Amino acid sequence: MNPRRKNRLILVMLVLVGLGLATALVMYALRSNIDLFYTPSEMVNGKGEQQLKPEPGQRLRVGGMVMPGSVKRDPNTLRVAFKLYDASGVISVSYDGILPDLFREGQGVVAQGVLQDATHVIAKEVLAKHDEKYTPPEIEDAMKKDHPAQAVGDNSVRPS
């Protein structure tokens, strides 16, 4: 092989290795920024056809209704614990911070944080649902399936 071809081959190989390394580093960095959305049912029963459940330590978002009577506030700190539910699942959430003004029992919320164990999330952010037109599609679909009267805003029908 003549020296010119050899140098060109080495240069091409170095560029390919560099691109591969850069791609691997970018993918590794972005991996920690992925937040998957779950409902309480999906956390308890699994998500999708393969019934995949989130693993402890995984970052996620969970959306559901705040269970009436479940909100517990620490009088000395901003720590709040509450439960989220839907048709077939209940999970507990701990949050240390100021809750949104619209947060209340029976209200739809989305908690973003880290899964501590199978049914407990330590939230870093809590968002309260305030209007149907601002609801993410996956939450709207889950709420229509689990709570049809509440999801479409029909206040005349209340579950007993």
UniProtKB/Swiss-Prot annotation:
GO terms for cellular component: plasma membrane. The keyword Heme applies. It is a single-pass type II membrane protein. Its main location: membrane. GO terms for molecular function: heme binding; metal ion binding. InterPro entries: CcmE, CcmE-like_sf, NA-bd_OB-fold. Keywords: Cell inner membrane, Cell membrane, Cytochrome c-type biogenesis, Heme, Iron, Membrane, Metal-binding, Signal-anchor, Transmembrane, Transmembrane helix. Residues 133-148 have a biased composition (Basic and acidic residues). The chain crosses the membrane at residues 9-29. Residues 1-8 are cytoplasmic. It is found in: Cell inner membrane. Pfam families: CcmE. Heme binds at residues 130, 134. One of its GO terms (biological process) is cytochrome complex assembly. Residues 30-160 are periplasmic. Belongs to the CcmE/CycJ family. NCBIfam families: PRK13165.1 (NF009638), PRK13254.1-1 (NF009727), PRK13254.1-3 (NF009729), PRK13254.1-5 (NF009731). Heme chaperone required for the biogenesis of c-type cytochromes. Transiently binds heme delivered by CcmC and transfers the heme to apo-cytochromes in a process facilitated by CcmF and CcmH. PANTHER family: CYTOCHROME C-TYPE BIOGENESIS PROTEIN CCME HOMOLOG, MITOCHONDRIAL. This is Cytochrome c-type biogenesis protein CcmE. It comes from Erwinia tasmaniensis (strain DSM 17950 / CFBP 7177 / CIP 109463 / NCPPB 4357 / Et1/99).
